[in-house]
């Protein structure tokens, strides 16, 4: 697999996350998204953005009835948002992006459903469970010219958002010539 592919994906993931987090207020049009799966804790970030009116969730694909009921109750979601068949949901709703908060082993199926429709996909880290899956996902992304992003949660940290705001938005420290970051979790 091309060694330059994953750093590019990481950069794209950071860019998408920053766009979703930092520029929603300035956006003329809200992003239309489909959520694939509700079993990853990071789904609460997008659900909270939905609750604040910062993003349009046009559909949710989830097979676990208990999760569906819990999210319907917590976020007052209508039945019409839910469809267990991701392919049918994507064809009907035509979102701009699919956010995959499902099991890692199911990330490939999300890309296989979305890529042929020209819909970009963000998955939670890690990208895949095997190199073969990752290579297939990369091949689909190239073939259908979509963005395939991996969400590294550290980009959502308040400290990183503040650093971005100070350096990029407010230009508080001037031009950055070199940057060394030690970040992450175990």
Model-derived segments and spans:
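Hydrophobic residues in well-ordered beta-strands that form the structural core
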Residues: 35, 123, 148-150
């Amino acid at each position: 697999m091309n060694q330059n592919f994953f750093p590019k994906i990481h950069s794209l993931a950071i860019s998408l996350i920053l766009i979703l987090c930092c520029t929603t207020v300035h956006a003329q049009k809200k992003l239309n998204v489909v959520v694939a799966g509700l079993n990853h804790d990071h789904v609460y970030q997008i659900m909270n953005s939905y609750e604040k009116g910062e993003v349009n969730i046009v559909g949710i694909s989830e097979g676990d009835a208990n999760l569906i009921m819990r999210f319907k109750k917590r976020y007052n979601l209508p039945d019409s948002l839910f469809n267990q068949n991701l392919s049918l949901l994507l064809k009907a709703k035509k979102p701009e992006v699919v956010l995959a908060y499902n099991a890692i082993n199911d990330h490939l199926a999300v890309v296989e459903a979305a890529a042929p429709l020209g819909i970009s996909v963000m998955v939670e880290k890690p990208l895949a469970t095997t190199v073969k899956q990752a290579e297939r996902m990369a091949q689909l992304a190239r073939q259908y010219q979509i963005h395939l992003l991996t969400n590294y949660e550290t980009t959502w940290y308040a400290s990183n958002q503040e650093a971005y705001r100070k350096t990029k938005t407010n230009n508080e420290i001037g031009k950055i010539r070199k940057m060394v970051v030690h970040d992450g979790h175990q």
